[in-house]
Amino acid sequence: MKALQLQEYKKLELVELPMPVCGPEDLLVQVQACGICGSDIHGFDGSSGRRIPPLVMGHEAAGIVVEVGVSVVGFREGDRVTFDSTVSCGRCAYCRAGTINLCENRQVLGVSCNEFRRQGAFAQFVTVPQNIVYKIPDSLSFEHAAMIEAVSIAIHATNRTPRHIGGSVAVVGAGMIGLLCIQTLRLAGFAKVIAIDLEDSKLKIATQLGATHTVNARSEDAVAVVMAITNGRGVDASMEVVGAKAPVQTCFQIVRRGGSVTLVGNLTPSVDLPLQTVVTRELSIYGSCASNGEIPQCIELLASGAIQVAPLITATAKLDETAQWFDRLYAGEKGAMKVIVKPNAV
């Protein structure tokens, strides 16, 4: 089969690889669409330490089942499916407690690190265990279904955030996940959703997708603007979707007394904690990692049109065009958001 392999950092090659072997509890999926994730871009240059070459990356995917393992139940050849990116063991204490995203033996598709190596979906075929696979309706395109993994991260982050129906929330970072969080937070009942970013183009999309207010932190004092919007009180909740020092600090500065800060971005390994602010204002901090069983909910929300992903898709690409898109995305091409790879397109 054809696959796009990271041969060394910043070097992707189209290669021929053996067909994946379908284990007894696995499904062999012909990949119809796979999104290029921001984490793939960070892995491309080795900065994340989680894409050690040689590796086939890609974890946001959808496709058609072409083979089922002998122990698989509930799936058959021809099923249209998507799948989670996190492979959980189902046996550890966290899995048994229902927190599969915290699995002690967790692996991630398209990731290689010191603990494991798992080939991903920038290939014509991929094998995935049946416990992370979900059927999708005929009405949902493969391109949109490839966005479900990203949507599940936004849904999980929203589920981790205390609800304030009619309340206010600020999303710091209007990238892909941030723009999805804006939609899920509106669905959760927040009346004021404030998008904060450094680029007007992203803030324009944020408005189209439901943000009631936008703030360009490059040209405006974000804290002052948010305080003006909330009559000096601060937002009920803030959500950081970048993973860097400055936006994390902004989240703590704009939240009201007794409010909450949800941390989704994890680009920077560590940031300073404003300890006295957290203690004296009695703030609650929530980490949000991947998703925890929200994919069926995401499928329903996309199929019904409650969440829009079409405005976030910049382009589709064949497998032999994908390396060029990695270069463009790595260079920070303005206006580029999600690129969907179609490994079996001719």
Language-model regions: role of each:
Residues 37, 74, 84-134:
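Cysteine-cluster motifs in flexible loop/terminal segments that predominantly coordinate metals
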Residues 161-165, 204-284, 346:
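Glycine-rich cofactor phosphate-binding loops and adjacent beta1-alpha1 units
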Residues 3, 249-253, 292, 296-346:
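C-terminal hydrophobic helical "lid"/dimerization subdomain
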Residues 131, 138-220, 224:
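Mid-domain Rossmann-like dinucleotide-binding core that forms the NAD(H)/NADP(H) cofactor-binding site
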Residues 20-34, 47-96, 137-139:
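Glycine-rich beta-strand-centered segment in the early N-terminal region that forms part
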Residues 1-62, 124, 342-346:
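Short N-terminal strand-loop motif that marks the start
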